[in-house]
Amino acid sequence: MARPGLGTDGGQRGNRQRIAAFADPDGRERNLALLRAALEAAAVGDPRAAYSTLIRPGRAAIRGLGPAFFTKVLYFASEGTSGTRCLILDARVAGNLYAAGWTSLPHRGNNFTYNWFTTTYGAYCELLQRWAGEATQKRNTAIWPDEIERALFEGPAA
């Protein structure tokens, strides 16, 4: 069983679909090309391009790799970028972000578990970058956008 907060439950939900997406000879090259393109966009600090490569209206571009999963991959791929860092966006973060006043996040009631628009994801990354800059100035110490994302993840809706 996975430890709490590591992004997967004891059942490893979705892993079979993720493995199948890259094991299937018919879809492998297409899926690898999509993943490579997204990782390249993340590495140069372009969260919108990275996200839009892996999302389609109402579904993921690669079966089993939805936004809650692939934004984690993009986060690590964007390490060290001089551009805007890709940040993790999942239902916990979205719920706490909504509770903090960012009400433009698409949702159904208290359900934030479906895909977000590319413009929403890009705005989210820019918002947390701006908040980090403001916090850095106030505290006179470096605050990073991913620290704010982590605080949102651990927030009251968790």
PLM region descriptions:
Residues 6-13, 76-79, 99:
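Amphipathic alpha-helical interaction surfaces
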Residues 2-62:
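Helix-hairpin-helix/helix-loop-helix acidic hairpins
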Residues 71, 78-158:
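C-terminal accessory module of base-excision DNA glycosylases/AP lyases that mediates lesion recognition
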Residues 53-56, 76, 111:
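A near-ubiquitous, low-amplitude feature marking generic local secondary-structure context
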Residues 1-4, 32-40, 85, 100, ...:
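Generic hydrophobic, helix-prone segments enriched in Leu/Val/Ile
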